[in-house]
C-alpha cells in the first residue's frame, strides 16, 4: 500500500511536518511518496492521501495547494476509492484556525472520498514541537488503514 503524503505550506511548517511523518511511515515499512504542492495528475490515482496543510490568509489553503483543490472541486471525478486524513497547522488567535482542514475535508467528501480518522489540528501557539505532536497522532491514521 502506498501512502501519498501531500503538503501545502506558506512558511514551511507544514512541509517539515509532512517530511517527518513520511520518514516515520518509512521506518514502519510503509511505501510512501512525498509531494509538496503536487500537480493533481501526480496524485489523483493514488488511494491513500495524508494531507498536511497550513491555513493561509483568511482561512485559505496555501498557494501551492489551493489550485489542486479548486481542480478537484471543478472536476466530475469520483474519488470514492480515495481514503484520506488531514493534519493542519494554524494559529488559534485567528477565527479561521485550521480552516484549511475543513476545506480539504469538505471538498474531498463532496467527491465521495472517505476520511478514515479524525483530523489533527495543531495550534502553533501552544505546540512547540509540531513534528512530534503529529507523530503522536500518526497511530490513529495507521490503525485506520
Where are the language model's segments positioned?
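Extreme N-terminal starter segment of soluble prokaryotic enzymes
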Residues: 1-4
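A short, well-structured beta->alpha microelement
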Residues: 26-41
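FMN-binding flavodoxin-like domain, especially the glycine-rich phosphate-binding loop
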Residues: 7, 12-19, 24, 28, ...
Amino acid at each position: 500500500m502506498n501512502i501519498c503524503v501531500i503538503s501545502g505550506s506558506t512558511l514551511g511548517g507544514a512541509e517539515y511536518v509532512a517530511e517527518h511523518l513520511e520518514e516515520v511511515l518509512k521506518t514502519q515499512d510503509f511505501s510512501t511518496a512525498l509531494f509538496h504542492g503536487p500537480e493533481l495528475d501526480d496524485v489523483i490515482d493514488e488511494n491513500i492521501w495524508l494531507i498536511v496543510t497550513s491555513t493561509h490568509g483568511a482561512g485559505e489553503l496555501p498557494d501551492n495547494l489551493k489550485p489542486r483543490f479548486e481542480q478537484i472541486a471543478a472536476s466530475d471525478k469520483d474519488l470514492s476509492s480515495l481514503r484520506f486524513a488531514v493534519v493542519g497547522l494554524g494559529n488559534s488567535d485567528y477565527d479561521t484556525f485550521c480552516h484549511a482542514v475543513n476545506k480539504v475535508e469538505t471538498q474531498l467528501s463532496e467527491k465521495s472520498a472517505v476520511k478514515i480518522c479524525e483530523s489533527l489540528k495543531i495550534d502553533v501557539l501552544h505546540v512547540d514541537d509540531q513534528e512530534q505532536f503529529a507523530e503522536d497522532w500518526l497511530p490513529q491514521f495507521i490503525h485506520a488503514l
